Amino acid sequence: STPSTKETAFWENGKHCWATPKDLSGKQFPVLMDTDRKITDAGLAKISSGLLPVGTVLLSSRAPIGYLAIAEVPTAINQGFIAMKCNGVLSSVFVLMWCVESMEAIIGKSNGSTFQEVSKSSFRSLPVVISPALILDGFSKIVEPLYRRIVVNERESRFLARIRDVLLPELISGGVRIQNAE
């Protein structure tokens, strides 16, 4: 569960990404590069899932169900996620795409009176067809470079947005002038 937000030792000057479903909402691409909040080592010690590795597929399991991303940074999560560590036969991109294609079945496993939630046990009961290694390798050779390009583009976009956020106020205030801008 989420370490107490009233305990400053868990949050103040935190250095570890702390993901909530809100961090995945509105994402154009399923890539988690950063989170709104950071958690400290002390806060991280209170979380049973610990710090999840890069490549973990995150699926919001409640409020709402179905936000997806691949963590591109080590990330701690709140209880609103199902985290899938992909260090075996199936790649992160394969698992992400399986989730997209299986979303109707995933949501069908939800229950709850106050709000719908997919429990980890009901999620685990969903069948996954694992293709032969030759097909999985072919899939990875085609899809992994495309996903890597998405990650690079997302990093570049974030970098350009930071430059814009620094330069625009300077341009508007006259602090920076562009020569020959006529």
Feature roles, as predicted:
Residues S1-P30, G43-S49, P64, N111:
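Low-complexity, Lys/Gly-biased intrinsically disordered segments
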Residues K27-Q28, L68, I106:
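Residues that scaffold the ATP/ADP-binding catalytic core of kinase and kinase-like folds
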Residues P30-V31, G174:
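Juxtamembrane "helix exit" motif at the C-terminal ends of alpha-helical transmembrane segments
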Residues T8-W18, V31-I39, S49-P53, Y67-Q79, ...:
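Short, surface-exposed loop/turn microsegments at beta-strand edges and helix-strand junctions
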Residues V89-L90, F94-A105, K109-Q116, S121-E182:
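Amphipathic alpha-helical coiled-coil/heptad-repeat segments
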